[in-house]
Amino acid sequence: KNLLLYNNIFIHDSSSYYETPSWPNRIFPKFFNVVIKINTQLSLVDLFKTVKKIEKIVGRKKALKNYPRICDIDIIDFKGLSLETQLNGQQIETPHPRMQSRNFVIFPLYELNKTWIHPKTKVKIDSIINQFKNSDFSDIRIV
């Protein structure tokens, strides 16, 4: 929290913490996920740079894709806009391009904003949730 405040990122609201099996390999430790709603005057690029800096400060190391990591901060939505840009060859896209298929993103987001609408597809969050399978509901729990 102090790292966010130090970087002029203010927490407006926060979901419960959600536990899910590691993905795609369930032999790894479980993941813990939370969605926070923030207020900031930072641009998308500056916010992206800041969250990458925070990940590094708390101990994130380069690892193979989908391997367990100490911290993974994604920008799910940025001011309700659909944006794409590049920074040093890395794609930055909001809303997050795979968010609608991830129960660990959608469920906590729904907890914070039951009327959220996907900025790109214009699909309501209720409709996104209704597309999940039963196993997507049983694989996640509030802790």
Question: What is each residue range found by the language model?
Answer:
Residues 23-31, 45-48, 53-143:
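Flexible, gly/pro- and Lys/Arg-enriched active-site loops
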Residues 1-43:
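Short, surface-exposed acidic-centric catalytic microdomains
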